[in-house]
């Protein structure tokens, strides 16, 4: 992956913000609680290895990803074998020995998984597993006492397996109404009584639960969205126990500036017509970069002023109405701060009627990531080259 890029569009990742958010969570939950840094989906679009290393430096003790490939990628990129990595999604039984050899723990939730995984035993290294219990999310997890006890029996009978953890996932921890959260929490407590083995790790808290209920998270918290400085929901913004620092910003530069007359039209479909003489700037970012067509009419920052996107967003470019003539090369901020004004990830999410999680995840590999510490560039990643 190249350290240079040749296009006037880039994302900036503030690693100091990541560090602060992890340290703040550690202080919030207490020293007896491990912080598991969730770096799936390329660390929510921020950069997996850079965020992982920063989170570990800040005090996280483990990493979590969505599937085995992501875990193996972290190992290849330099995360040492002494750092445990948990795969949160399903993994085929035949890959269990590979995971074990790389100190990658797998999520298990079916007894028949063990029946198939045993075929590949004995393993050179035992496999750590985390048993997932479905307390009401309805996604992955065992639901009955029989299922749980069958898995426990399989683990007890085969030295290739170690029950390292048991966990569940809350569906509504980020909502003000706590009824369903309380139901899931009580269900988890009840299901834990089915275990004849006490695993070292018991975890139920995502970012929302960790922030709101530090007394109900057992001994580990899976720190995802708020590690990146984003509130788990709009409802939770007023409930945050400490301020979060947003790590992701997105920028570009004007590549063309022109004056159009009233009545002239802009972009595909000729959906925008200038009412009077206007200055129009072209910005080299489009929906192939994850800046969706639905961003039409959204305003970005240029020279500290709000400039609306006019006409349809193209695959690689878009046009904005400038407040006045500006030179080619002027910086355009799509997410982030400029001259005291700020556009947040939440602002973008609200415009396209989605959640903040989706925005940095959507910004594609075509957009280089610049990593900052102490406001200085320490690394550039360009996945195109």
From Swiss-Prot:
Q: What is its EC number?
A: 5.1.1.1
Gene Ontology CC, one term: cytosol
> In which pathway does this enzyme or protein participate?
Amino-acid biosynthesis; D-alanine biosynthesis; D-alanine from L-alanine: step 1/1
Per the UniProt entry, what are the Gene Ontology biological process annotations, in alphabetical order?
D-alanine biosynthetic process; peptidoglycan biosynthetic process
Keywords, in A-Z order: Isomerase, Pyridoxal phosphate
User: Recorded GO terms, molecular function?
Assistant: alanine racemase activity; pyridoxal phosphate binding
Q: Check the record and name the Pfam families matching this protein.
A: Ala_racemase_C, Ala_racemase_N
This protein's record includes keyword Electron transport = no
Instruction: Tell me the enzyme class.
Output: isomerase
Q: Which family, according to the similarity comment? A: Belongs to the alanine racemase family.
Listed name of the protein = Alanine racemase
* Lineage of producing organism: Bacteria, Bacillati, Bacillota, Bacilli, Bacillales
């Amino acid at each position: 992956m190249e350290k240079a890029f040749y296009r006037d569009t880039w994302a900036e990742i503030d690693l100091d913000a990541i560090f602060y958010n992890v340290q703040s969570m550690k202080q919030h939950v207490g020293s007896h609680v491990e912080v598991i840094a969730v770096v799936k989906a390329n660390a929510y679009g921020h950069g997996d290895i850079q965020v992982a290393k920063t989170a570990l430096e800040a005090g996280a003790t483990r990493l979590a990803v969505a599937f085995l490939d992501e875990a193996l990628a972290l190992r290849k990129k330099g995360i040492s074998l002494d750092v445990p990595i948990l795969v949160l999604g399903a993994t085929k039984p035949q890959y269990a020995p590979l995971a074990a050899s790389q100190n990658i723990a797998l999520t298990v939730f079916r007894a028949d998984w063990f029946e198939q995984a045993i075929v590949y035993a004995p393993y050179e290294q035992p496999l750590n597993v985390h048993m997932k219990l479905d307390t009401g999310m309805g996604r992955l997890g065992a639901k009955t006492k029989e299922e749980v006890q069958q898995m426990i029996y399989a683990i007890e009978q085969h030295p290739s397996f170690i029950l390292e953890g048991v966990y569940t996932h809350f569906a509504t921890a980020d909502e003000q109404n706590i009824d369903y959260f309380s139901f899931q929490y009580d269900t988890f407590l009840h299901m834990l009584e089915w275990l004849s083995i006490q695993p070292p790790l018991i975890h139920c808290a995502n970012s929302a639960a960790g922030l709101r209920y530090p007394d109900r998270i057992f001994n580990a918290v899976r720190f995802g969205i708020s590690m990146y400085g984003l509130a788990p929901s709009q409802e939770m913004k007023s409930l945050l126990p400490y301020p979060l620092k947003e790590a992701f910003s997105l920028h570009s530069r004007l590549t063309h500036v022109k004056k159009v007359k009233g009545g002239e039209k802009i972009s595909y479909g000729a959906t925008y017509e200038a009412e009077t003489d206007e200055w129009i700037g072209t910005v080299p970012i489009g929906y192939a970069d994850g800046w969706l067509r639905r961003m039409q009419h959204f305003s970005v920052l240029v020279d500290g002023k709000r400039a609306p996107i006019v006409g349809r967003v193209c695959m690689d470019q878009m046009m904005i109405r400038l407040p006045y003539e500006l030179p080619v090369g002027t910086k355009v901020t799509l997410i982030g701060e400029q001259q005291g004004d700020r556009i947040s990830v939440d602002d973008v999410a609200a415009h396209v009627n989605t959640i903040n999680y989706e925005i940095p995840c959507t910004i594609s590999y075509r957009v280089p990531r610049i990593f900052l510490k102490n406001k200085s560039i320490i690394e550039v990643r360009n996945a195109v080259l």
